[in-house]
Amino acid sequence: MMNFTKLKNRMHNQLVIDKRLKVVCLWYLLFLMISVRKHSLRAAADFSGLATSQFSRFLKNHTDVAVYNLNQLSKKQAKQFCPVLKSLAKGQLPWKVAILIDSTIEHRSSLHTDNVKRFNHGKGFVIGHQWTNVVLIINDKLIPLTPIPFYTKSYCREHNLKYQTENALVVQYIDQLNLQDYIGAHDPKQVVVLADSGYDDRKIQKAIIKKNGILSLP
């Protein structure tokens, strides 16, 4: 079993980040790994002994750090598993690589929360944040890729952003995704994209076909 100090040191060595930000980043990641009723900045401060303002400034001013580190770690992990690509599900499926696309809705944490929307979530309506998770599966190992954030129309107006629908964002993501950065040279026909019926969109299908991939919906 790995003790706390070893865990911290291991995580510390994986992060490509300015030295002065590493302490805040590390404590925030550790805080997100524990099970608590509410992952708030105040709770993160209580857990770490740092000031709430340190976490607030870190999240507000360094959003690119998380994206960059996730990209680097995903590529590093993928390259460890890709030298010998095996068929998925221990050889029971014809493909060797799978990309999973699935949306997640996080319930709002308070009445006054930015970028929340009322979503139809199958069994009723949910008010919260939405983003789209993208996961790569190689040799039955799950590797998270950068998720796709969704911004509401009101949030886009307030922050001078161009509003895009969730499906339009998925199309853009697929167009820009270069699998070769993760698994090197490969046969696109060995890649399957798995998504739920909410992504049964002609533009998404065309984006996947353009990459020579295969789309599978329930």
Spans of model-derived segments:
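Gly/serine-rich nucleotide phosphate-binding loop at the start of the catalytic core
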Residues: M1-Y68
